[in-house]
């Protein structure tokens, strides 16, 4: 077994250069990333391979699964621009994976699946499962998994934390409900991981129960929730609702500080932490 972090983001040097060369969102201005939802200061050193491997050692993580966060807005670009940036990220990521001595695995950002353990998509894409079907069929054929991440989007006149606290959870709740409504029955064996506890899925299941839905019918052993950005109370509720076998550890490094979530997971004791960080995510990997 391997201690795994299923939710990290890593920008290859060529991708950083490509963002720095742009003048429309998403782009980099020095160490500030300019997105449709605002401007955010970054420490670009967090995307250096050596520093990332040191962070894995610090957290006791043996393998990190890295993806390109859909919140930067590539899905809102013209197809040609998006495809160019995706290709740069995927090629650079495969090079980093090859250089990391087995410490990294990658998720496709929408290009080729070759060399990747799965694919990451934005939450909004689950609103049109027919359009997503070719990717889902191919993932199922390969025995790979789908990772659903918040899509993000432009916001105006809101504080910097607005998207993370209001937009992302709502998007993930909608994605989770879209999957329950139309995806699960079509791809019942495809492993699907919803980031950030699907935006608070247990609360939504209680709402479903008030509408006459048998909550037990919504629990599926191919659907997983990652723990990124949450602490003990939220994780405990998910364990009570879904069972510990459906939770996987995610940190959202370098976007979020991993320490609070990691501390919460470890606080449940060795057996629970072993399931969330080791047994469950390992089931998703080839």
Which sequence ranges carry the predicted segments?
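Long, low-complexity, intrinsically disordered polar/charged segments
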Residues: 27-30, 34-35, 112-125
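Short glycine-enriched loops at secondary-structure junctions
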Residues: 69, 110-112, 150-154, 254-255
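Hydrophobic/aromatic residues located in beta-strands of well-ordered beta-sheets
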Residues: 3, 64, 104-106, 146, ...
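Short, well-structured secondary-structure segments
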Residues: 43, 52-56, 60-85, 92-96, ...
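Active-site gating loops and adjacent loop-to-helix segments of metal-dependent hydrolytic enzymes
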Residues: 9-46, 77, 83, 153-169, ...
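Mid-to-C-terminal alpha-helical segments outside catalytic/metal-binding sites
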Residues: 1-6, 12-63, 91-98, 200-201, ...
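Charged helix-capping and loop-helix junction motifs
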Residues: 82-89, 128-134
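Catalytic pocket-lining loop regions of alpha/beta-barrel enzymes
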Residues: 115-248
């Amino acid at each position: 077994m391997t201690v795994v972090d299923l939710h990290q983001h890593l920008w290859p040097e060529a991708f950083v250069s490509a963002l720095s060369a742009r003048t429309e969102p998403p782009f980099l201005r020095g160490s500030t990333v300019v997105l449709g939802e605002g401007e955010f200061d970054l420490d670009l050193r967090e995307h250096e391979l050596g520093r990332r491997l040191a962070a894995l050692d610090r957290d006791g993580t043996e393998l990190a699964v890295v993806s390109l966060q859909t919140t930067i807005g590539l899905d809102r670009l013209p197809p040609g621009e998006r495809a160019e940036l995706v290709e740069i990220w995927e090629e650079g990521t495969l090079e980093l994976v090859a250089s990391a001595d087995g410490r990294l695995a990658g998720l496709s950002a929408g290009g080729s699946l070759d060399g990747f353990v799965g694919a990451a998509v934005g939450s909004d894409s689950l609103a049109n499962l027919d359009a997503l079907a070719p990717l889902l069929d191919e993932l199922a054929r390969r025995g790979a998994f789908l990772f659903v991440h918040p899509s993000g989007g432009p916001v105006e006149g809101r504080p910097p934390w607005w998207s993370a606290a209001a937009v992302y959870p709502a998007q993930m709740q909608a994605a989770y409900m879209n999957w329950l409504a139309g995806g699960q029955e079509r791809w019942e064996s495809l492993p699907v991981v919803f980031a950030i506890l699907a935006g608070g899925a247990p609360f939504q299941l209680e709402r479903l129960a008030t509408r006459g839905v048998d909550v037990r019918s919504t629990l599926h052993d191919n659907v997983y929730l990652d723990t990124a950005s949450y602490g003990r109370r939220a994780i405990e509720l998910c364990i009570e609702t879904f069972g510990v076998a459906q939770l996987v550890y995610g940190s959202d490094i370098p976007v979020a500080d991993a320490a609070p979530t990691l501390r919460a997971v470890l606080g449940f004791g060795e057996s629970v932490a072993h399931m969330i960080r080791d047994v469950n995510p390992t089931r998703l990997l080839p």
